[in-house]
Curated annotation (Swiss-Prot):
Record-level GO BP terms: intracellular protein transport; vesicle-mediated transport
Gene Ontology molecular function: GTP binding; GTPase activity
Function in brief: GTP-binding protein involved in protein trafficking; may modulate vesicle budding and uncoating within the Golgi apparatus.
UniProt keyword annotation of Iron present: no
Binding site for GTP: 24-31, 67-71, 126-129
N-myristoyl glycine-type lipidated residues: G2
UniProt family annotation: Belongs to the small GTPase superfamily. Arf family.
Protein name listed in UniProt: ADP-ribosylation factor 1
Origin species: Oryza sativa subsp. japonica (Rice)
E.C. number: 3.6.5.2
Tissue expression remark: Seedling shoots.
Amino acid sequence: MGLTFTKLFSRLFAKKEMRILMVGLDAAGKTTILYKLKLGEIVTTIPTIGFNVETVEYKNISFTVWDVGGQDKIRPLWRHYFQNTQGLIFVVDSNDRERVVEARDELHRMLNEDELRDAVLLVFANKQDLPNAMNAAEITDKLGLHSLRQRHWYIQSTCATSGEGLYEGLDWLSNNIASKA
């Protein structure tokens, strides 16, 4: 009886670990998001060549977040990070109307990869503080998210510099990855 209770207790209260891959076009705000979540503050960033990886502790979950550079020359390297990814965060600059089609193409190219077939998708519609930013509904449309019938996805409006929307996104990820486990 005691052993059964111990197993149940540890299953309920043990820290869960989740591997998250965060990608998106260059200058979308990925690194700013990563360090806002990790440190709770805004850090000065430079374009990411390669990757940053940090562990973010939130609600008894340890998120290992891989932030991979988004410049067009290094996007082919994204595929090297796909294996064992449980959640995919795709960050979009909501103010960048000129490149939203490029963002859509990169997203759909990635989602066609077999190694990501089981990963849930969270889209961060970032930079919502800017006056010309597209709202989440417009980005949903422009990214063609409704066509993703076989994929569990969610879009969250965010502002990396204030932190608005970031933890709501982590809540969705934790609930939806946990339900698939």
